[in-house]
A protein has these predicted regions:
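N-terminal Rossmann-like NAD(P)+-binding subdomain of aldehyde/semialdehyde dehydrogenases
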Residues: 1-129
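Conserved small-residue-rich beta-alpha loop and adjacent elements
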Residues: 121-181
């Protein structure tokens, strides 16, 4: 397996072996990121803030909707990976994959609705007929650290809203379940 870093899939010299928790057999290997890789990820994420900020809500909706469709399309493969890597029974793994697609679709729909508010200021002395307003703007870079308990579904709980709001994201999966995340 390779690591997605700075807009491309990259290999690393150092690897971490992912083992099946039931029989201890190797499932796959994943790259072990170096300090240099982390610095590259941070730099790339910060460079990505401006393009992300410029995407319309509808564009972010399309990205997240497409991600949900891809998850649904690969349900069986993803469920089997969860089973091999984490040890969940296949029925629970399938449910997790379905929930992942739903979570991505919720974020997709919210991307179209992110807006500010109009606030009447007449509750303050001298404010009279004035109105205030708020704007929702991207924060910049979001670090999405996910636990191993629901390794696929908890990633979009962090990544989905971050993308919906126009942020750049760095995802860090749990060490126990790096394949599925």
């Amino acid at each position: 397996m390779k690591m997605f870093l700075a807009e491309s899939w990259q290999d690393c010299l150092e690897k971490i072996e992912v083992l099946n928790p039931y029989d201890g057999q190797p499932v796959d290997t994943v790259p072990k990121a170096s300090l240099s890789d982390v610095e590259t990820a941070l730099k790339s994420a910060f460079q990505g803030t401006q393009p992300m900020r410029k995407l319309s809500g509808f564009d972010r909706f399309k990205i997240l909707k497409r991600a949900a469709e891809l998850v649904e399309k690969q349900l069986e493969d993803l469920a089997r990976t969860i089973t091999l890597e984490e040890g969940k029974i296949l029925a629970e793994a399938r449910f997790e994959v379905s929930r992942t697609a739903e979570t991505l679709m919720v974020s997709a729909e919210e991307a179209k609705r992110i807006a500010g508010e109009m606030v009447p200021l007449d509750g303050a002395p001298g404010a009279g007929n004035r109105m205030g307003f708020t704007l929702r703007v991207p924060c910049g870079v979001v670090l999405a650290i996910s636990p191993f308990t629901f390794p696929l579904n908890l990633v979009p709980h962090n990544v989905g809203p971050a993308i919906a709001a126009g942020n750049s994201v760095i995802a860090k999966p749990a060490a126990q379940t790096p394949l599925i995340a």
